């Protein structure tokens, strides 16, 4: 029990602040890739692997912590993750070999798994008709932590010569770790798991292996998880790669490259609430924007947003090939906007599908979605190594087309109406309990 009486808005503020910090720490290495590469003798391919490695713990970690949040409560889980992330971030500041540094940063990167913990926490406090907007605010402002890191860290630590460290990136990792530990204490002390004890108990009791398997294998969850690969997976891949892209592709220095990259992160983060709000609004107004999917209001918006991603990624390649950096920054902003809208749309659907299993569902979708953050940086770095640094984006866009087609197929009204029940094995024995949700 927290020290003060929590409301849904106080819970939203607490979760959002903690996730914003988590996201900042997750990608705190990105502004310092040049310094890190120089100190450890890394190539562009090595940097691509480092950016990819930042995502390795996210898929299994999100899947596990989503279920743990249902079972044991978000306050406890969020506090534990922030505490060990802070410890390893501080430890990475003292690394003298790249092998030790690499392992420590993989552990620090598990800060990204807190996303599903906060999604579960917020869903336990807000009514269904406000879920899209509330989750969009949480994730949008939280995701903007990457932009905050890109803007603040190189300015605060770029020329660091203060106590303990003579290298900026080491100071940045140490002091952000300290802040993470302090936030862990705040979350455990003030957080409350649900609006009522009854709701927290119902969620905990539903967190079983059988219900998790059922949730993970429904058609709707599988389609949205892959949709999250092409939206959030894309976002985190770009957060890790864009500072390197602007530095190598346009000859920008550390601060300027990070600032250009931050425009993408700001769009991908701060515009996400719009995606959730539009989804909520279409449901309230019962408005069809894609008549082919008549009556499936959230699904229509999600498919439209996914299409926007494919188009904008193609545009980013063409913008980069012009050599005009401002045009490329603008194109990157549009990619960030498309990611934001799609992510907001997807997580307006997920908690509504499984209100008493929101942690498990969010963990599955959020966990699978991060695979894009592992694979896409490899495409970017290998294309760059072949002298085609701008071409990686259109290659990724082409890889997304089958995912878009699958989501359009699942969104057809007669399939979408049962996408939370029908799946890859017989779900009939769960159907009655799902109706109760």
From Swiss-Prot:
Keyword annotations: Cell membrane, Membrane, Nitrate assimilation, Transmembrane, Transmembrane helix, Transport
Factors inducing expression: Repressed by the presence of ammonium as nitrogen source.
Gene Ontology molecular-function annotations: nitrate transmembrane transporter activity
Positions of transmembrane segments: 12-32, 36-56, 76-96, 106-126, 134-154, 171-191, 221-241, 250-270, 300-320, 327-347, 359-379, 391-411
Entry superkingdom: Archaea
SUPFAM superfamilies: MFS general substrate transporter (SSF103473)
Main location group: membrane
Topology versus the membrane: Multi-pass membrane protein
Protein name: Probable nitrate transporter
Source organism of this protein record: Haloferax mediterranei (strain ATCC 33500 / DSM 1411 / JCM 8866 / NBRC 14739 / NCIMB 2177 / R-4)
